[in-house]
Curated annotation (Swiss-Prot):
It comes from the Bacteria. One of its GO terms (molecular function) is mismatched DNA binding. This is DNA mismatch repair protein MutS. It comes from Dichelobacter nodosus (strain VCS1703A). ATP binds at residues 613-620. Keywords: ATP-binding, DNA damage, DNA repair, DNA-binding, Nucleotide-binding. SMART domains: MUTSac, MUTSd. Gene3D superfamilies: 1.10.1420.10, 6.10.140.430, DNA repair protein MutS, domain I, MutS, connector domain, P-loop containing nucleotide triphosphate hydrolases.
């Protein structure tokens, strides 16, 4: 669009002037009953929303592209845009519609990370706005969920740690400096570039102090030169840009510390399918499978707890004690039923602060507040045995006066929007009641005035009427005009009657005609005042919302434990994981067959387990269930096992499955080695490592050598608790030579034609993978199976056990053999006594030695 604004029509000039302030956002421009988009915005909207792109007028002979959506359907279209990561500006008609150009102004800015509208948010997900800043090769970021008031900073992260946090948070929107270079995985998320000055450290510090109305941030426990403050400053500036009238309420700024939570990198999160399965769906993920929550806020809290398990045992035990107390003393079904009737207080509280809460949401808040005594009663007995539940019940008692206020203020079923009116209950506002009396009983009031005038004048034939020209009037026959009182004012003379008005009739007319507008204005003012009153209790409401959500998750854990016979895990200060009859929490619920439970023992004297067994025998399931049991335990849940004992585990690593990275230009094997390198460089004795079939992406000897070296490194250097699944039977020799390793295998039974997977862990190794049996089960043609069997027998006959055994000995035990020539040279050197050699003899000996070396075969050097 290379035209001057002055070349356009007045309406289009107005559009372009507003658009200049929002070049990267889609501008929805209100024109009558539609919101219109023009030029490139129209083309983008047409593609994104699947709407028709037409034209409206021309400029320099070329049509101006235009697309539009009906005003009543705007929210549906905005929801579609937000799901695609797009942002939009809503420009409304704010002036009177009449002659000339209608005044318009931007009333809303919609971006994925700053949403608070109920119909645009996913109720089951946190809505994260993240601001990213790079300083001295480390990444610092601030993130906020304005729907719940959270505002956090992170420590400096490397690229892998950043990717892990992005995977955990899954931000709705990312902000970053205009000129910054970032990893490819950030670029793929389409971050919104912001001016570099938004990240200026001094400006950011001032902006944070202004927001919290302080002169320093020392009270937050954050250093004034912390680079993450630059990210926080940008985030606040962005909120200023998108919320011009009311800034979202944010709780005091907090800094997140690694030592509080179990570290899970992005690969591990994906491999363990915590929130999404490997195909990208939430169904059949761990969270979806264990979710028994009754509220949306509970689901969001459950996701946070599973995605960020605790590692400090005292806090985990608080949750455990609450689950135990609920299991022992509470009616879990009744608690769940009562919680289902509660509203999303967390998000309603934010909308109250922003003055965007709808009347119906206040009614939901009222009804929830009225439910609190019942919820409290259901939790009371359990709370006596749990400090966490006791604190929750205290929080539930903070807002009784708000419930009483809303009961008095609101009608039983308020309208959806404020402009519909009829929000407040009778008796709450006497002035409003009087206006409603006017609008609801106008006919009776006119009838009453008519009777009063008849009584005062004796004119029994007078009537009060109305027309659009003259409004309300008193009508009497012309024959009685002489008897009209002096204070009557003649309005109109007709053939058979005279029409008059009185001051009282004009006053009543004005009141009747204006009553509805006055009532709406009064309701709007009273509604704003009600929101301000409610917002004064914001902190109490947030605490109440947290108490309800956490009680919901704890009840979810208790119901899950009761339904599926989970046990309460024990914790120790040792480095260990010991599980008796452990089960996979997802597979056991999805399988129609009884799940085969298995034991696991890992500790400092049994650090690494080489796991062998048949394809499809359950190796991956066994390893994943171990990691999931640890995560559930650290989240505060009971676990699917008969017994479990978890030591000091601070981090989980996984290397499972095979996939390439086409976008990043990495082969399957390169991905495998990158993930392996991450584990070898970062795992320590407090880590749980899951390794599945290392080395299968290359040649047999390369793969076997790598697998051996990796396992050896994990045993001797990392000393992490490790499950190492492999089809290289030769690896079983490694742990036979190392006192801190052991072999285990998954058993199977076979005859000549069939195999039965027993899915049971046994001590020791197995040399068979039963790959041909699995191929047969998969439907591979019989001729191929026959040829494969023949080739297998041929290869097994050619196997040289001694050579394979020698190849896999530890490097230090493999002594190279020397040729006779080298042995001869070494022997001659050993026989020389340097002290007895004359200079001439020494010189001759050097020449002789040089001749001997020259005669050696080059391959023997």
């Amino acid at each position: 669009m290379n035209t001057k604004i002055s070349e356009h029509t007045p309406a289009m000039q107005q559009y372009l002037t507003i658009k200049e302030d929002f070049p990267d956002l889609l501008l929805f421009y209100r024109m009558g009953d539609f919101y219109e988009l023009f030029f490139d915005d129209a083309k983008k909207a047409g593609a994104l929303l699947n709407i028709t792109v037409t034209a409206r007028g021309k400029i320099r002979g070329k049509p101006i592209p235009m697309a539009g959506v009906p005003a009543h359907a705007l929210e549906n279209y905005l929801a579609k845009l937000v799901k695609q990561g797009m942002s939009a500006v809503i420009c409304e008609q704010v002036g009177e519609v009449g002659k000339g150009l209608v005044e318009r102004a931007v009333t809303r800015i919609i971006t994925p990370g700053t949403l608070t509208d109920e119909n645009l948010l996913d109720e089951a997900r946190d809505s994260i706005l993240l601001s990213l800043f790079c300083f001295q090769n480390n990444y610092f970021f601030a993130y906020a969920d304005i729907t719940r008031g959270d505002f956090q900073l992170t420590m400096g992260l490397n690229e892998q740690e950043l990717q892990s946090e992005i995977e955990r948070l899954r931000p709705a929107e990312i902000l970053m400096p205009e000129t910054a270079n970032v990893p490819a995985f950030i670029t793929a998320l389409k971050p919104h570039r912001q001016p570099d000055w938004y990240f200026d450290s001094d400006s950011s510090y001032r902006l944070i102090c202004e927001y919290y109305q302080t002169t320093t941030i020392d009270g937050f426990g954050i250093a004034p030169d912390d680079p993450a403050l630059s990210a926080a400053g940008c985030l606040l500036q962005y909120l200023h840009d998108t919320h011009k009238y009311h800034l979202p309420p944010l709780k005091p700024l907090q800094k997140q510390h690694d030592h509080q939570y179990l570290l899970l990198d992005a690969t591990t999160r994906r491999n363990l399918e915590l929130e999404y399965t490997l195909n990208g769906e939430s169904k059949h993920s761990l969270i979806a499978t264990i979710n028994r929550c009754s509220t949306a806020a509970g689901v969001r809290t459950l996701k946070r707890w599973i995605n960020q398990p605790l590692i400090q045992h005292e806090y985990i035990l608080e949750r455990q004690e609450a689950v135990t107390a609920l299991l022992t003393h509470a009616d879990l079904d009744e608690i769940a039923k009562t919680l289902r009737a509660t509203a999303d207080i967390e998000r309603i509280t934010t909308r109250i602060a922003l003055q965007t809460a709808k009347p119906r949401e206040l009614a939901q808040l009222r009804d929830t507040l009225m439910q609190l005594p019942a919820i409290n009663a259901l939790l009371q007995t359990s709370a006596a045995h749990s400090p966490l539940l006791a604190a929750a019940t205290q929080a539930l008692m903070h807002c009784p006066q708000l419930g009483d206020l809303l009961m008095k203020a609101l009608v039983e079923a308020p309208p959806l929007t404020l402009k519909e009116g009829g929000i407040f209950a009778a008796g709450y506002l006497p002035e409003l009641d009087a206006l409603h009396e006017l609008t609801d009983h106008s006919a009776q009031l006119l009838e009453k005035m008519e009777q009063e005038e008849k009584a005062q004048t004796g004119l029994n034939t007078l009537k009060i009427g109305f027309n659009r020209v003259h409004g309300y009037y008193i009508d009497i026959p012309r024959s009685q005009a002489a008897n009209a009182p002096a204070h009557w004012i003649r309005r109109q003379t007709l053939k058979n009657s005279e029409r008059y008005v009185t001051e009282s009739l004009k006053t009543l007319e004005e009141r009747l005609l204006n009553a509805q507008d006055e009532a709406l204005a009064l309701e709007k003012q009273a509604y704003t005042e009600l929101l301000i009153t409610l917002d004064k209790q914001r902190d109490d409401l947030y605490r109440l919302a947290t108490a309800l959500a956490e009680s919901d998750v704890l009840t979810c854990f208790a119901r899950l434990a009761k339904e599926h016979h989970y046990c309460r895990p024990q914790f120790s200060n040792q480095i260990e994981i010991q599980i008796t009859a452990g089960r996979h929490p997802v597979v056991e619920q999805l399988s129609a067959q009884p799940f085969i439970a298995n034991d696991l023992v890992l500790h400092q004297k049994r650090q690494l387990l080489i796991l062998t067994g048949p394809n499809m025998g359950g190796k991956s399931t066994y390893m994943r269930q171990t990691a999931l049991i640890v995560i559930l335990a650290l989240a505060g849940s009971y676990v699917p096992a008969k017994e479990a004992r978890i030591g000091r585990i601070n981090r989980i690593f996984t290397r499972i499955g095979a996939s390439d990275d086409l976008a990043g230009g990495r082969s399957t094997f390169m991905v495998e080695m990158t993930e392996t390198a991450n584990i070898l460089n970062n795992a320590d004795e407090h880590s749980l490592v899951i390794m599945d079939e290392i080395g299968r992406g290359t040649s047999t000897f390369d793969g076997l050598s790598l697998a051996w070296a990796v396992a050896d490194h994990l045993l001797q250097k990392n000393r992490a608790l490790t499950l190492f699944a492999t089809h290289y039977f030769e690896l079983t020799a490694l742990v036979e030579r190392h006192q801190h390793g052991a072999n285990i295998h998954l058993s199977a039974a076979e005859d000549q034609e069939h195999i039965v997977f027993l899915y049971h862990i046994e001590e020791g190794a197995t040399s068979k993978s039963y790959g041909l049996h699995v191929a047969k089960l998969a439907g591979v043609p019989q001729a191929v199976i026959h040829n494969a069997n023949a080739k297998l027998r041929q290869l097994e006959e050619k196997r040289v056990p001694q050579r394979a055994h020698q190849a896999l000995l530890p490097i230090e035990s493999q002594k190279p053999s020397l040729s006779p020539q080298i042995k001869n040279i070494l022997q001659q050197i050993q026989e020389i006594n340097p002290d007895e050699l004359s200079p001439k003899a020494a010189h001759e000996w050097l020449y002789q030695l040089k001749t001997l070396v020259r005669d050696l075969d080059k391959n023997e050097l």
